[in-house]
């Protein structure tokens, strides 16, 4: 199928693969959009239409999922998990985790929800 809708869907699938490969690195929506030859605004609209999430929220949610796994399956410190999941500081990680999960990472480790 070479329809524009199919081509757009292929680009979003490729963007998701790109995001997953670079998830724990510094990653911007502009960089992901450029990787599939789309403008940031067009990419963001297409991505949300296909996934239900804006691109940056998708990145955050994937990072939080990985952090939950690391918190419950390793003895890594919260700081180590912050850096391992692509955050540039422990404070940013804690804020993001609390905003998305509802509790702090340390408490999640003790009482996973």
Would you name each region that the model predicts?
Residues 5, 9-12, 29:
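Short, structured helix-loop boundary elements
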Residues 14, 18-62, 76, 82-107, ...:
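Basic/polar phosphate-binding segments, predominantly the helix-turn-helix DNA-binding elements
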């Amino acid at each position: 199928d070479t329809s524009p809708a199919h081509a757009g869907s292929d680009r979003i699938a490729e963007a998701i693969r790109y995001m997953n490969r670079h998830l724990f690195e510094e990653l911007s929506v502009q960089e992901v959009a450029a990787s599939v030859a789309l403008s940031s605004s067009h990419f963001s609209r297409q991505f949300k239409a296909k996934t239900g999430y804006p691109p940056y929220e998708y990145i955050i949610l994937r990072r939080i999922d990985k952090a939950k796994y690391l918190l419950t399956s390793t003895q890594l410190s919260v700081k180590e998990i912050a850096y391992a999941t692509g955050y540039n500081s422990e404070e940013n990680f804690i804020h993001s985790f609390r905003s998305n999960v509802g509790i702090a990472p340390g408490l999640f480790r003790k009482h996973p929800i």
